Design a protein with these regions (language model features):
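Active-site loop architecture of trypsin-fold serine endopeptidases
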Residues: 1-36
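C-terminal recognition in membrane/secretory proteostasis and scaffolding
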Residues: 14, 27-157
């Protein structure tokens, strides 16, 4: 069973033993057909930077402990998220030990697929969606769940 494709090896003596880097097979499956056609693969992009919600961050925001999502930290100017009026964090809150971003939208799901981390958000976009496609985001804004449509764009180079 193929799990990845070797792409590079770091070695001290020029041999094939050392630290290897591989492209995951799901990534290759998504990209290779486009490349075979002689086309450039356009990664779908929503135009945010975000952060995972830790247990303490959720507590500081007064969210349920079992609620997962990605807090939008920053919205890229002119990007899809800005066009869809998504909001990055506005202020910080403290739990007497740490400060946490607050006031930003929290992405809960993409087309009903739950999102619990930035890594998962990237994977869901990459494996299931294309640039130019419109997706439906479930967002938590000011403790209220709302739906926001967003048209994916190609990730800037």
């Amino acid at each position: 069973k193929v799990i990845g494709i070797n792409s590079q090896i770091i070695t001290q003596n020029g041999g094939n033993a050392g630290i290897g880097f591989a492209v995951p097979v799901n990534t290759a499956k998504a990209i290779v057909p486009t490349l075979i056609k002689g086309e450039k693969f356009l990664y779908p992009w929503i135009g945010i930077s975000g952060m995972n919600l830790s247990k303490n961050h959720k507590k500081a925001l007064e969210l349920e402990e079992n609620m997962d999502g990605v807090m939008i930290v920053d919205v890229m100017i002119g990007g899809p998220a800005e066009k869809s009026e998504l909001k990055g964090y506005q202020e910080t809150i403290s739990d007497n030990y740490n400060s946490y971003p607050s006031g930003g939208d929290i992405i809960l799901s993409i087309n009903e697929i739950p999102i619990s981390s930035m890594n998962e958000l990237s994977s869901v976009l990459f494996e299931n969606h294309s640039s130019g496609e419109t997706i439906s985001l479930s967002i938590l804004r000011d403790l209220e769940k709302i739906k926001v449509d967003l048209e994916l764009e190609p990730r800037p180079q």
